[in-house]
Amino acid sequence: MKVLIGVDESRESRDAVKTSFELFGPNAEYTIANIAGRFGTGVLFNVGYAPTGQLSAKYLTEQFAAAEETARGAAELVPGGDVEIDAELGDAGVELCRLAEEQTSDVVVIGSQDKSVWQRLLDPSVGRYLIDHAPCPVLVVR
C-alpha cells in the first residue's frame, strides 16, 4: 500500500503521521510531503519591495529548504524511518493531488486543523480540496 502524508508544522500533522503508521503498519510505502506556498508579486509590492530575479530565487530556495526540513522532521516519527520525503512549492491541495497521481498512492492522509468560518474564508481548507479532487481516498485525522 502506498501512503502519501501531507504535513506542515502542526501537531495535527504529527498525529496524522503516527495514525498512518498505526493503521497501515510497517509494510506500507510512506511518502511524507510538505508543500511550501509560493508568493505572488503582490506580496513583495505590498511591503514595499520590487521583486527581482535574485530576490525571488533566494526566497524560493529558502521556502524549499524549509519544506524539506518539515518533511524530514515528520519522517522521524515513523518507526524504522523507511520513508520517502518530498518537498514542493505551490498550492498544497493541488500539489498533493499531483503527487498522489504520480505516485499512484492508495490513500492521502492529512491532519485536520479546526478553523473558524472566518479562517476558512481567508485560508481555504486543503482537506476539502483533497476530498473533492484527489485521485484516491483521503483520510483526514482529527
Predicted regions span which residues?
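Small/aliphatic-rich secondary-structure junction motif
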Residues: 1-54
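Short conserved AdoMet
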Residues: 25, 79, 135
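General small-molecule cofactor/ligand-binding pocket signal
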Residues: 31-33, 84-88, 139
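Short secondary-structure boundary segments
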Residues: 34, 111-113, 142
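A short acidic, glycine-rich active-site loop
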Residues: 52-69
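Structural beta-alpha unit
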Residues: 75-108
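Glycine-rich, Arg-bearing micro-motifs that act as flexible, cationic patches
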Residues: 107-132
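Short, flexible loop segments at boundaries between secondary-structure elements
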Residues: 132-142
